[in-house]
């Protein structure tokens, strides 16, 4: 798992209070990890702060899984 993936996983665990083994790259924030719309907004803000990237609303709407977040952050940080 990449450094970005590890950091995303840590943020998800802290914000959603889920078990680490549930946070896989395929895990959906809403369907698999029990996040609601407010949780997803808070996660995006936490990702922006942690990685120093800006995630516009239209992009945030496409980040549905842990893997989506990792891919977007890696691309935005490149």
Curated annotation (Swiss-Prot):
One of its GO terms (molecular function) is acyl carrier activity. The keyword Chloroplast does not apply. One of its GO terms (biological process) is lipid A biosynthetic process. This is Acyl carrier protein AcpP. Residues 2-77 form the Carrier domain. It is found in: Cytoplasm. Pfam families: PP-binding (PF00550). Gene3D superfamilies: ACP-like. HAMAP family: Acyl_carrier. Keywords: Cytoplasm, Fatty acid biosynthesis, Fatty acid metabolism, Lipid biosynthesis, Lipid metabolism, Phosphopantetheine, Phosphoprotein. The keyword Aminoacyl-tRNA synthetase does not apply. Carrier of the growing fatty acid chain in fatty acid biosynthesis. Its main location: cytoplasm. Pathway: Lipid metabolism; fatty acid biosynthesis. It comes from Mesorhizobium japonicum (strain LMG 29417 / CECT 9101 / MAFF 303099) (Mesorhizobium loti (strain MAFF 303099)). 4'-phosphopantetheine is transferred from CoA to a specific serine of apo-ACP by AcpS. This modification is essential for activity because fatty acids are bound in thioester linkage to the sulfhydryl of the prosthetic group. Belongs to the acyl carrier protein (ACP) family. PANTHER family: ACYL CARRIER PROTEIN (PTHR20863), CARRIER DOMAIN-CONTAINING PROTEIN (PTHR20863:SF76). It comes from the Bacteria. GO terms for cellular component: cytosol; membrane. The modification O-(pantetheine 4'-phosphoryl)serine is found at residue 37.
